[in-house]
C-alpha cells in the first residue's frame, strides 16, 4: 500500500538523494532535503542539528558521510535512527554498501530502532564515472584507478533512486534488504571502453596499485582520508562482489538499467 508521509532526505544533495527528491515531488510527497549546506541543516558531526532537521518527518532516507564503513558510523546512525523513531518516524530507509561487513553494525542499528525499515545495499555507482571523483581522469584521457581487472556489476543511481522512492512510500518494502546491481559484470577497462565509444572521447584505463593511488590523492585529500579510500577500494574491488543480484527486479518488477544506457545518457559530460 502506498502512503504519503512527510519525508526527510539526509544527504539529499548527493547522487541518489537529489534523484529521490525528484521522484517524491513528482508524486506529491511532502519532502525536505537536509545536509550541511541545505536550508534544513544536518551535520553528522553536530548532533545539535539532528532534532531540528527531523522535525515532523514520518519517513527518513539515511545516507551517511563519509561512508557507512567508518568505525563511528554505527553509533551515529543508530542514535539518529532511534531519535527519528522517538519523534514519530514510521519508516527508515538506509543506503548501504554491498559486500562490506563493516556496514553491518549500522544496518543492525537501523533494523532495531523500532520503525519499519528497508536496507538498500548498492554496487559501485555508474555515476562515479560522470559525477564523482573518476570524471576528471576521463576528461584528461586516462583513468588511473586501483581496480585491476576485477569485474563489477555497476548500478545506475536512477535504479537506486527508484528503489528508495518506492521504499519510502510503499509499506510492502518494509523489512526488506535489497542488494542492487546492474545487469552485467564489467571491468573498469570495459566501462572506460564503453564511455569512449559513446562519448567519442579517447580514454584509456590504467590500473594502479593502492600505494600509487594514495600518492595521486595526496595533493587533494588529507592523508587519513586518502588512506581510508585506498583501503575501502581494496576491500570492495577484490573480486568478492563480482556477481549479479536480482534486487532491482525484486523491488521494482523490472530489469536494472544497463551501463550502456547510463553512458549514453551521460555522454555529454565527457565530450
Where do the model's predicted regions map?
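Oxidoreductase cofactor-interface core, primarily capturing Rossmann-like NAD(P)-dependent enzymes
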Residues: 2-37, 45-48, 55-58, 67-71, ...
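A hydrophobic C-terminal alpha-helical subdomain
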Residues: 13, 211-271
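Conserved Rossmann-like nucleotide-binding pocket used by diverse enzymes
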Residues: 40
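Periplasmic-binding protein-like
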Residues: 61-63
